[in-house]
Regions:
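Conserved nucleotide-sugar phosphate-binding/catalytic loop shared by glycosyltransferases and other
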Residues: 7-12, 30-81, 155, 166-169
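Short amphipathic alpha-helix
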Residues: 15-27
Length: 170
């Protein structure tokens, strides 16, 4: 595949909205979108620049509970969903062989970064705009495998020693 492929990944909701803050970059590369947001289609003008949109169905199942429900997923079901997500990420990385993976989180970041690293990709993590004084769990897990970390609040520079701050995405 093309060696200029940049993969942009984000879970539905706020992570996806923040990822769309990078829309000016999408058309500058052969870009692939990885998401669980089924509303992300080529019908949306800002997404027409993507070479492909890859959906992670396992990412949806990995969520502990659905919005408004207090019922939690069993640990076995959560691990099974996460292993399926890792397999999906492996297949996506193998298919596209991205040079760079950029994510705003959440669920997809860890398996996608691990698979991307094995395939030789550089990784960029953008910490959530919702976090001002504390790292996200995703940030904690990907901090040491990220080639670059960007934070959206200057206060976060104290928590991430190698991070860079350029302001908020949205």
């Amino acid at each position: 595949m093309d060696s200029r492929i940049v993969m942009f990944a984000g879970s539905q909701g706020g992570h996806y909205v923040e990822l769309m803050g990078l829309k000016d970059l999408f058309g500058k590369y052969d870009s692939i979108l990885v998401t669980d947001n089924l509303k992300a289609t080529f019908d949306k003008p800002e997404l027409q620049v993507f070479k492909s949109i890859e959906y992670s169905s396992a990412m949806v199942k990995c969520r502990e509970r659905k919005a408004g429900s207090s019922k939690k997923q069993s640990r076995i079901a959560a691990v099974t969903s996460y292993l399926k997500m890792f397999q999906e990420c492996w297949n996506i990385c193998k298919k596209w062989n991205p040079r760079v993976i950029v994510t705003t989180g959440s669920y997809i970041a860890v398996p996608l970064f691990l698979c991307g690293k094995i395939h030789g990709a550089k990784t960029i993590f953008i910490e959530s705009n919702a976090k001002v004084y504390k790292k996200t769990l995703t940030g904690i897990l990907v901090e040491h495998i990220s080639d670059k970390i960007y934070v959206q609040w200057p206060e976060m520079l104290k928590l991430y020693s190698q991070a860079e701050y350029y302001g908020p995405l949205i």
